[in-house]
Amino acid sequence: MGKLFGTDGIRGIANEELTPELAYQLGRVGAYVLIKGAKDAKVVIGRDTRISGDLLTSAITSGFLSMGVDVIDLGVIPTPAVAYLTRELQGNCGIVISASHNPAEYNGIKFFNHQGYKLPDEIEEQIETYILNNEEIENRVTGAAVGKRIELKEATRLYMDYLKTTIECRFEGLKIAMDLGNGAVYEAAPQLLKELGAEVIIVNDQPDGMNINEGCGSTHPEVVQRLVKENKADVGLSFDGDADRLIAVDNTGAIVDGDSMMAICGTNLNEKHILNKNTIVATVMSNIGLDLAMKEQGCQVVKTKVGDRYVLEEMIKEGYTLGGEQSGHIIFLKYNTTGDGLLTALQLIATVKESGKTLSELSGMMTSYPQVLVNAKVKNENKLAYMEDEVIMGEIKMIEEKMNGVGRVLIRPSGTEPLVRVMLEGQEQAELEVLAHGLAQLIESKLG
């Protein structure tokens, strides 16, 4: 597979790229690198609903057990629940078997440290080096020193009970429509919202191992949009396969994306004086409408590179409490260490309930400006050369002047392909299309 770890753990087609042999090795090496020398060591492991979940969970579990580490098996459970329970159960680390929003034939393995944070790059590199170099780890315990597997049947209940403590109201009188994506949240989400008093309408709650994300979930918001309209629901919720992100829909059927949810929840937290430093952390791809909406509330938006790990890094470094991505990865750092779809849903619904307004009224506080994204094919070695090209920089300056302060140009070299991504944001969609394609063609002609 070459380099094992990507930006969100290890991913691949299960039993072809991501094999049980590799998972077993990850268990052994993970135990050696993360836990060596720890007394009464234990790890916490959970998975989504993919058919290959059992295969990979069994294999990585065997690796840990062979190193004398106990494994607490949480079963099928959302990714953020693994992060929370790693802390709560005082695990030495946590492991998630999931490929998030990818199709069912894929799977992934992701590690959390003992605090529930993703591993830093240098630790992932250590694990990777051992495996890619086939370095043998001698430690093979025997007898009573072999690790034990412990099944924690009440894992989802512990997570749901914790989430209830993050809000101060109940949801009686609200009708919530949900697309559960045949994923990890298929039991927890409807159960929790019913317990909080909401009327619940659900689809895609029958996982069969192969239907996770299949025409449903957060990458197919049209499913929950239809459900909201048909049932006259107050709020629609659409989760991805491992429930670390959420896309919402308002009472009119309009999409409420990560930017809008951050504006709504951020304003609510700010009014309660619990939005630390009056700041939200977003990525460079977030809509300029978020900046303008938060400015009106006397708040600021700090921008990072694309990726929830960079958002989290900035939040930890500066002590911010709310951050996320347009795609629906929202981090409420006071409550969890990773994007959490179900937690975000509770915070959003609680804001609706406490405000006495509809979600469409609340989302009206932010105007999303049209965004146009065009890829320009360039040679790999030329991906940063646009900054030195006077003609390209002159064209960018001309476009920015034309926008007159209401809009922007963002050029992002791809990390994995010979591409430069051209993103324009402004008031007029048609004009943006012309300008973005023109700029992309210019970049291709000069650097392709």
UniProtKB/Swiss-Prot annotation:
It catalyses: alpha-D-glucosamine 1-phosphate = D-glucosamine 6-phosphate. One of its GO terms (molecular function) is phosphomannomutase activity. InterPro entries: A-D-PHexomutase_a/b/a-I (IPR005844), A-D-PHexomutase_a/b/a-I/II/III (IPR016055), A-D-PHexomutase_a/b/a-II (IPR005845), A-D-PHexomutase_a/b/a-III (IPR005846), A-D-PHexomutase_C (IPR005843), A-D-PHexomutase_C_sf (IPR036900), A-D-PHexomutase_CS (IPR016066), Alpha-D-phosphohexomutase_SF (IPR005841). It comes from the Bacteria. The active site is at S100. GO terms for biological process: carbohydrate metabolic process; peptidoglycan biosynthetic process; UDP-N-acetylglucosamine biosynthetic process. Its EC number is 5.4.2.10. Keywords: Isomerase, Magnesium, Metal-binding, Phosphoprotein. Binds 1 Mg(2+) ion per subunit. Its cofactor is Mg(2+). GO terms for cellular component: cytosol. It is an enzyme of class 5 (isomerase). Mg(2+) binds at S100, D240, D242, D244. The modification Phosphoserine is found at S100. Activated by phosphorylation. HAMAP family: GlmM_B. Belongs to the phosphohexose mutase family. Catalyzes the conversion of glucosamine-6-phosphate to glucosamine-1-phosphate. This is Phosphoglucosamine mutase. It comes from Alkaliphilus metalliredigens (strain QYMF).
